[in-house]
Design a protein with these regions (language model features):
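Alpha-helical transmembrane segments in inner-membrane proteins
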Residues: 1-270
Length: 270
């Protein structure tokens, strides 16, 4: 495997295979590098990519917009604002140094969603897709400007904030991987179960309502799941773009427009 320390592919495969089946692990530095550093990074990267891609596919189906992803709703920018705030204020929990960033990112993601939906409802009682997108874009620009302002006054925290905003999973461990896995199992499972409803949304909200879909609750449920997943991913890996936008379109080349096949393949490709 590639990295600052070269480990032969055979050694990498042997370490992972023996660890999976409880066999005696090879001695040497390669065991520590593979199991302690690189394996959790790879797992976290796979889970984060799959979650972001799944969120993008769900958003594109819900909003009927091929350019939609997590950033369209403004949730990604809100989660980034929460994480930057945690880094700037040094918020942490004993024994879990990353938990402060994660909690703040999730809280700001949910708060952003509530604010965007509230503004959308006040402007349009029907909460049309166009209104939600418009409010999301406006809030995303506002949150990005606040992040720039906080970065300018961050002082000694400038390096850590700048490095985090670039997006990196180099610090991911097994704890972060388990959190990602749990979030993906819960919220991703809900999104996968909404495949038929998203197929109905692709025909328009009125058509979906006539087909028996509870438009309001389904829309709210999908948005909450997307916001939660993005909050977790942003807190672990920083602001990562284009995955939720590009991967769903690549998956459609193989599955077509049916979300019953699109969502699982998007999750796998991500």
């Amino acid at each position: 495997s590639l990295g600052s320390v070269a480990v032969p592919i055979g050694d990498t495969a042997a370490v992972i295979w023996n660890a999976m089946w409880g066999l005696e692990l090879p001695q040497g530095i390669s065991r520590t590098i593979i199991l302690g550093v690189r394996l959790p990074r790879v797992l976290a990267t796979a889970l984060c990519g799959g979650a972001l891609a799944l969120c993008g596919a769900a958003m594109q189906g819900l909003l009927r917009n091929p350019l939609a992803d997590g950033s369209t709703l403004g949730v990604s920018a809100g989660a980034s604002l929460g994480a930057v705030t945690a880094l700037l204020l040094g918020i942490s929990f004993p024994g879990l140094p990353f938990a402060g960033t994660m909690v703040m990112a999730m809280l700001f993601a949910m708060g952003s969603l509530i604010l965007i939906l509230s503004l959308s409802y006040s402007a349009d009682r029907g909460m049309s897709t166009q209104t939600i997108i418009l409010m999301g874009v406006v809030f995303s620009m506002f949150a990005t400007s606040i992040i720039s302002l906080l970065t300018a006054f961050s002082g000694e925290k400038l390096r850590s904030i700048t490095f985090w905003t670039m997006g990196s999973l180099s610090g991911a461990g097994y704890t972060e991987t388990l959190v990602l896995l749990g979030a993906l199992a819960v919220f991703g499972g809900v999104l996968l179960s909404c495949a038929d409803e998203l197929n109905a949304f692709s025909l328009g909200e009125d058509a979906a309502r006539h087909m028996g879909v509870a438009v309001g609750p389904v829309k709210l449920g999908v948005l909450v799941c997307v916001a939660s997943l993005i909050g977790v991913c942003v807190s672990v890996g920083g602001s990562i773009g284009f995955v939720g936008l590009i991967v769903p379109h690549a998956a459609r080349l193989f599955t077509g427009a049916s979300h019953r096949r699109l969502l699982p393949l998007t999750l796998f490709m991500g």
